[in-house]
Every structure is written in C-alpha cells, then in structure tokens.
C-alpha cells in the first residue's frame, strides 16, 4: 500500500526530451498549455492539474487521480529545475512524504 514516485521537469535536457519522447514543438505546446513537468508520465500544471494536451491522452500510466487511492505516496525528487513540478505534485494533495535535498526543500518552504 505504498507508491514511490518521482517527477520530471519540462526542459530541453529532461529525460523525456533526451529519450526523444517529446520534441521541441511538443515541449513548446506543453508550456503553452501550462505544463511545468510530468507526474506519472502525465503533464501537470503548477496546481497539479493534468493539462489538456494530446500527450496526456495517449500515455499508458497510472492516472494521477489514482494516487489519491494509495495510502502512502512517497515523492522522491530534487533539484532546482524540478521545483515547479514538485510544487505541482504537492499541490495535488496526494503526496504523503517528500524525499528531497536540502536546497530544494528550503526553496519549496521559503518560496
């Protein structure tokens, strides 16, 4: 009854971009839709809402809404570039534990 998850940032050197899972045009369109990164391979905004984008309609992954049904959800992630998507994941209200580095933790707590 636990899920250990992470998030991905939305930038040219992200894992999704480096693996060619998204291209520059898709990255730009995701930004335009308000995406800050991905949670469970679904693109979310700063409030943790899944953005309206074609990539979210064709992904095969645990729907982020299902995270609410898991008793213990642990998010392990850190780094300056991931702060917006970590914040989005936390804003969803389904994360129970955050494992991160000191710098990221301080930025999240102090804005």
Residue ranges and their predicted role:
Residues 1-111:
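Conserved phosphate- and dinucleotide-binding cores of soluble alpha/beta proteins
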């Amino acid at each position: 009854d636990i899920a250990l998850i992470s998030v991905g940032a939305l930038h040219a050197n992200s894992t999704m971009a480096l693996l060619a899972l998204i291209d520059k045009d898709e990255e730009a369109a995701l930004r335009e839709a308000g995406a800050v990164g991905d949670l469970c391979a679904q693109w979310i905004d700063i409030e943790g809402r899944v953005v309206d984008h074609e990539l979210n309609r064709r992904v095969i992954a645990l729907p982020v809404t299902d995270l609410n049904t898991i008793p213990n959800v642990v998010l392990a992630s850190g780094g300056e570039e991931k702060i917006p998507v970590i914040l989005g994941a936390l804003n969803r209200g389904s994360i129970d534990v955050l494992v991160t580095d000191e710098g990221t933790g301080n930025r999240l707590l102090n804005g």
